[in-house]
């Protein structure tokens, strides 16, 4: 149990996918202008990333490795992620039309989020078992969502601030992301891998 807790804390804070591994930067910069959209993207990513992580692990363990097709991992994982996103979109549309309208634009964007593919590939490279893959996928998504919501809240405050003209827009956003990355480096001694 302690190993799973360390994996959770380590992935969310110490080895954050956005601020440490630099995966998922496109949605991080593009969808984080408003807090509501960041929360919607974070919620959708959490569900999809956890499910895709488990499905990719199962496909790797039960299909690719036994058949000696490990060289097809990346292509197969991309297909698995696309299927999971489509399945999620259909399930959400059927069960909760209100949630579908809220998350509708974000679900197709998750297919192109490199963090989802990164989690699937890192699960294989780190030889995680089923439960570790689920925890790793969930904690990567929680870390992604946490950073995205924090960044969106900061960007909303910056929109109201008196920022010098040369730093407005993408410049101040990148400076803020760098400062957040430095802040998260403070967690580096929290968990030793």
Curated annotation (Swiss-Prot):
Extract one GO BP annotation from the record.
electron transport chain
Tell me the membrane topology, using the record's own terms: Multi-pass membrane protein
Tell whether Coiled coil is among the UniProt keywords: no
Where is this protein primarily located?
membrane
Q: Where in the cell is it found?
A: Cell inner membrane
Transmembrane domains' residue ranges: 5-25, 39-59, 62-82, 102-122, 134-154, 171-191
**Can you name a GO cellular component term?**
plasma membrane
Task: Identify the EC number(s).
Answer: 7.-.-.-
Q: Which keywords does this Swiss-Prot/TrEMBL entry list?
A: Cell inner membrane, Cell membrane, Electron transport, Membrane, Translocase, Transmembrane, Transmembrane helix, Transport
Q: Does the keyword DNA-binding apply?
A: no
Give the family per the record: Belongs to the NqrDE/RnfAE family.
According to its UniProt entry, what is the function of this protein?
Part of a membrane-bound complex that couples electron transfer with translocation of ions across the membrane.
Q: Please name the NCBIfam families in this protein's record.
A: PRK05151.1, rnfA
**What HAMAP family is this protein classified in?**
RsxA_RnfA
- Subunit structure comment from the entry: The complex is composed of six subunits: RnfA, RnfB, RnfC, RnfD, RnfE and RnfG.
Protein's name according to its UniProt entry: Ion-translocating oxidoreductase complex subunit A
Originating species: Edwardsiella ictaluri (strain 93-146)
The gene coding this protein: rnfA
């Amino acid at each position: 149990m302690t190993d799973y807790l360390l994996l959770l804390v380590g992935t969310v804070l110490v080895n954050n996918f956005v601020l440490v591994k630099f995966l998922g930067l496109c949605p991080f910069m593009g969808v984080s202008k408003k807090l509501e959209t960041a929360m919607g993207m974070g919620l959708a990513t959490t569900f999809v990333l956890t499910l895709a992580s488990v499905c990719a692990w199962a496909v790797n363990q039960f299909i690719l490795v036994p058949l000696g097709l490990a060289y097809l991992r990346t292509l197969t994982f991309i297909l698995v992620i696309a299927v999971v996103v489509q399945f999620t979109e259909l399930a959400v549309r059927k069960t909760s039309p209100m949630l579908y309208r809220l998350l509708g634009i974000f679900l197709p964007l998750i297919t192109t989020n490199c963090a989802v593919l990164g989690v699937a590939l890192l699960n294989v490279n780190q030889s995680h078992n089923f439960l570790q893959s689920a925890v790793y996928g969930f904690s990567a998504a929680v870390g992604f969502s946490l950073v995205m919501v924090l960044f969106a809240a900061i960007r909303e405050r910056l929109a109201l601030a008196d920022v010098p003209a040369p730093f407005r827009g993408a410049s101040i956003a990148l400076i803020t992301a760098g400062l957040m990355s430095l802040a998260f480096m403070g967690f580096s001694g929290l968990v030793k891998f």
